[in-house]
């Protein structure tokens, strides 16, 4: 399979923030548009606040890879606090991008990204969800920013 036929996305969040739900919603939307998809979470202790990782593969052809994603095209960080305890840029392709839920600008957050030199996008998903939805559901604006 040509790697350009497949987009791989890795999500980082905490239990209860909706990263898994956003991942699965993206898979459903891509499937509904005729794509082949995978969407699955990986997490340890099932408790609110524990770090979780979720993965998407979206392709025009059948996805024959069945493993975690180690070299994603995109990384979505739903909880900025994870940047200091998880290597969110691990394996991220140089021509990819990272989307981070933060009040900081891309220039302000870049020093925390362990030397990553690719595209950095930031969005204050907590503020947006509080203003629009009335509660902190950061997964919703993060999903919109990803699409």
Residue ranges and their predicted role:
Residues 1-147:
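Active-site cofactor/cluster-binding pocket
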């Amino acid at each position: 399979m040509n790697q350009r036929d497949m987009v791989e996305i890795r999500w980082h969040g905490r239990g209860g923030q909706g990263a898994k739900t956003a991942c699965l919603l993206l898979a459903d939307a891509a499937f509904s548009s005729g794509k082949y998809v995978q969407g699955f979470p990986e997490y340890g202790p099932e408790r609110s606040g524990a770090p979780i990782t979720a993965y998407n593969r979206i392709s025009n052809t059948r996805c024959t890879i069945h493993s975690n994603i180690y070299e994603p095209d995109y990384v979505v960080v739903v909880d900025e606090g994870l940047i200091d305890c998880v290597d969110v840029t691990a394996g991220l392709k140089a021509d990819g991008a990272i989307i981070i839920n933060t009040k900081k600008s891309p220039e302000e957050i870049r020093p925390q990204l362990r030397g990553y030199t690719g595209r950095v996008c930031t969005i204050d998903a907590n503020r947006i969800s509080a203003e629009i939805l009335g509660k902190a559901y950061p997964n919703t604006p993060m999903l919109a920013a990803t699409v």
